[in-house]
Amino acid sequence: MAKEHNHLQDVFLNTLRKERIPVSVFLVNGIKLMGRIESFDQFVVLLKGQDQAAQMIFKHAISTISPSREVVLPQRDAEA
């Protein structure tokens, strides 16, 4: 179950990164950050803002990632 959750998370973040989709990242303390996903791993997301400054955000501090446009995820193999 955890592996599947991480798979969906990875696919979503990787799609945002590859398509360079601008995102709003809302932190658990209410702060809103804006930029593009530059990179990510198991624990952090690297967000690059319009001023090209990078911010490393710990995933446990993220509440929501909201893309600026619709995101079409790649189709997974036939699963029920």
UniProtKB/Swiss-Prot annotation:
InterPro entries membership: Hfq, LSM_dom_sf, Sm
Entry keyword annotation includes RNA-binding: yes
Tagged with keyword RNA-binding: yes
Leader sequence segment: none
Cross-referenced PROSITE patterns: SM (PS52002)
UniProt keyword annotations, A-Z: RNA-binding, Stress response
GO biological process: regulation of DNA-templated transcription; regulation of RNA stability; regulation of translation, ncRNA-mediated
GO molecular function list: RNA binding
Cellular component annotations (GO), alphabetically ordered: cytosol
Chain ranges of the Sm domain: 10-71
Function, as annotated: RNA chaperone that binds small regulatory RNA (sRNAs) and mRNAs to facilitate mRNA translational regulation in response to envelope stress, environmental stress and changes in metabolite concentrations. Also binds with high specificity to tRNAs.
Family: Belongs to the Hfq family.
Quaternary data: Homohexamer.
Protein's name in the database: RNA-binding protein Hfq
Provenance organism: Thiobacillus denitrificans (strain ATCC 25259 / T1)
Lineage, opening ranks: Bacteria, Pseudomonadati, Pseudomonadota, Betaproteobacteria, Nitrosomonadales
Chain's gene name: hfq
